[in-house]
Design a protein with these regions (language model features):
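Charge-dense, low-complexity intrinsically disordered segments
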Residues: 2-3, 80, 84, 127
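Oligomerization/assembly interface segments of phage tail-like spikes and tubes
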Residues: 62-78, 132-144
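Short, solvent-exposed beta-strand/turn "edge" segments of beta-rich domains on protein surfaces
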Residues: 56-63, 127-131
Length: 147
C-alpha cells in the first residue's frame, strides 16, 4: 500500500493555487508548514490530514478514506469582521473541490477517487493581540482506491 498524503495535498494545492480571488486580488494558498509571519490577508491554509485504510480492498488493491481540513484565514484589527470574505472564498473552494465525478482530482497513475464529500464547514473567531482572527474551516473527505 502507498501513502497518498503528499499526493492529495499537492493536487488540492494545484487546484486552488492562482484561481482563488477576492475583489480582484489572488488569494495565497499555503501548506500548514509554510505560512510566512507577514502573510497577506486573507489566505488559505491546507491544514490537518487524516487517512484510514478501508477494509473494502482486494488482494490487488487498497482503499482509503482521507480527510483534509482547509482553512480560510483573515485577521482584522478591530473586534469584528471577515466572515463575508471567508464565506466567499470558502464557496470558491467548495466549487473547485466538491465537483461531480468528471471534475474529481486526478490521482493517476496509482490512485483514483471514488467519492468526494464536503464533510463539514464552520466559522471560528479567535481574539488575538491586534484584533480578531476569523477562520473558516472546511473539511473534505475523499474515498479512494489504489489502482
Amino acid at each position: 500500500m502507498k501513502d497518498v498524503g503528499q499526493l492529495i495535498r499537492t493536487k488540492v494545492y494545484d487546484r486552488l493555487f492562482g484561481v482563488l480571488e477576492y475583489n480582484g486580488q489572488n488569494i495565497p494558498v499555503y501548506d500548514s508548514a509554510g505560512v510566512p509571519a507577514n502573510a497577506a490577508q486573507p489566505y488559505v491554509l491546507l491544514s490537518t490530514f487524516n487517512s484510514t485504510e478501508l477494509l473494502e480492498g482486494s488482494k490487488q488493491s487498497y482503499g482509503q478514506e482521507l480527510s483534509l481540513l482547509i482553512e480560510v484565514c483573515m485577521k482584522f484589527d478591530n473586534s469584528f469582521g471577515g466572515k463575508l470574505i471567508c464565506d466567499n472564498i470558502s464557496n470558491q473552494i467548495t466549487e473547485l473541490i466538491r465537483t461531480r465525478q468528471a471534475g474529481y482530482l486526478d490521482l493517476s497513475p496509482d490512485w483514483y477517487i471514488i467519492r468526494t464529500l464536503l464533510e463539514s464547514t464552520n466559522t471560528l473567531e479567535q481574539p488575538v493581540s491586534t484584533g480578531v482572527l476569523t477562520r473558516r474551516l472546511i473539511r473534505f473527505t475523499f474515498k479512494i482506491q489504489q489502482q
